[in-house]
Curated annotation (Swiss-Prot):
Main location as per UniProt: cytoplasm
Cellular-component GO terms for this entry: cytosol
Subcellular localization(s) per the UniProt record: Cytoplasm
Its job: Activates KDO (a required 8-carbon sugar) for incorporation into bacterial lipopolysaccharide in Gram-negative bacteria.
PANTHER family: 3-DEOXY-MANNO-OCTULOSONATE CYTIDYLYLTRANSFERASE, 3-DEOXY-MANNO-OCTULOSONATE CYTIDYLYLTRANSFERASE, MITOCHONDRIAL
Enzyme nomenclature, EC number: 2.7.7.38
UniProt xrefs under CDD domains: CMP-KDO-Synthetase
Record-given protein name: 3-deoxy-manno-octulosonate cytidylyltransferase
Alphabetical GO biological process terms: CMP-keto-3-deoxy-D-manno-octulosonic acid biosynthetic process; keto-3-deoxy-D-manno-octulosonic acid biosynthetic process
Length: 248
C-alpha cells in the first residue's frame, strides 16, 4: 500500500527558536525525522517548511522540500498547501509526521497509513496507554476516549475519563482506560481539502487541539494503540537535552 509522508517543519517556536535545525548528535533534528520516515517505506517524503535554512538542511540530506507560507495556524493547514502544490489525487493516503519527533518509530508511521487504508474514515491516529497519575493530570499530555469500535469520542488536555471514586483516593496509578494521544495523523488528500474549508470550532480554540475540528463537523477519527511507544518529542530546551542523551 503506497502512502506519502509530509513533515511540517515550522521554523519559529516560542520555547525553542529555530527548532527544526537544533543539533542532535551532529545532525539537525529535521534530518533525524526525515531518516525515520524513510524507514517507513513511504512512496514519497516531503518536508513542508517556511524557512530557507530548513530547506537547505533537508536538501543537503537528499530530501524533498515544499516551501509553504509562514502564517498557517496548524500543521494540517500547512499540509493542505502541499497537497494543492503537488496536485495529489483525493484518494492519496498522507501521513502527517511532526517535525519535532526525531525518535518516532518507523513502524507506527506505517501503522497509521495501514489503519487509514483499511477504513472509510476521515482520519486515523494513534495513542498509548497511560499508567501513572502524573501523566493523566498533565495538560501537555493530550488524552483521548474511544467508543467500542476504536473511534474517538473526544480529545482533551483535561483528565478524561474522570475516575470519580479512585481519584478521590489520591492514587499514583490509573486504570486501564486512559490513553495519551500521539501527534501523528493519516488522512486522504481529499479529506485535507475539506478540513481546511471548515471554520475552526469553539472546542478547538478552547483546547488548542486541531483534531477537535474533525469531531465538531461530525467526521470520525479512528484511534489504534501504537505498536511501539515513541521516544521523547522536542518542545522545550529540557526535552532537547533529554533526546540528545537518549539518542547517543
Amino acid at each position: 500500500m503506497s502512502f506519502v509522508v509530509i513533515i511540517p517543519a515550522r521554523y519559529a517556536s516560542t520555547r525553542l527558536p529555530g527548532k527544526p535545525l537544533v543539533d542532535i548528535n551532529g545532525k539537525p533534528m529535521i534530518v533525524h525525522v526525515l531518516e525515520r520516515a524513510r524507514e517507513s517505506g513511504a512512496e514519497r517524503i516531503i518536508v513542508a517548511t517556511d524557512h530557507e535554512d530548513v530547506a537547505r538542511a533537508v536538501e543537503a540530506a537528499g530530501g524533498e522540500v515544499c516551501m509553504t507560507r509562514a502564517d498557517h495556524q496548524s500543521g494540517t493547514e500547512r499540509l493542505a498547501e502541499v497537497v494543492e502544490k503537488c496536485a495529489f489525487s483525493d484518494d492519496t493516503v498522507i501521513v502527517n509526521v511532526q517535525g519535532d519527533e526525531p525518535m518516532i518509530p518507523a513502524t507506527i508511521i506505517r501503522q497509521v497509513a495501514d489503519n487509514l487504508a483499511q477504513r472509510q474514515v476521515g482520519m486515523a491516529t494513534l495513542a498509548v496507554p497511560i499508567h501513572n497519575a502524573e501523566e493523566a493530570f498533565n495538560p501537555n499530555a493530550v488524552k483521548v476516549v474511544l467508543d467500542a469500535e476504536g473511534y474517538a469520542l473526544y480529545f482533551s488536555r483535561a483528565t478524561i475519563p474522570w475516575d470519580r471514586d479512585r481519584f478521590a483516593e489520591g492514587l499514583e496509578t490509573v486504570g486501564d482506560n486512559f490513553l495519551r494521544h500521539l501527534g501523528i495523523y493519516g488522512y486522504r488528500a481529499g479529506f485535507i481539502r475539506r478540513y481546511v474549508n471548515w471554520q475552526p470550532s469553539p472546542l478547538e480554540h478552547i483546547e488548542m487541539l486541531e483534531q477537535l475540528r474533525v469531531l465538531w463537523y461530525g467526521e470520525k477519527i479512528h484511534v489504534a494503540v501504537a505498536q511501539e511507544v515513541p521516544g521523547t518529542g522536542v518542545d522545550t530546551p529540557e526535552d532537547l537535552e533529554r533526546v540528545r542523551a537518549e539518542m547517543r
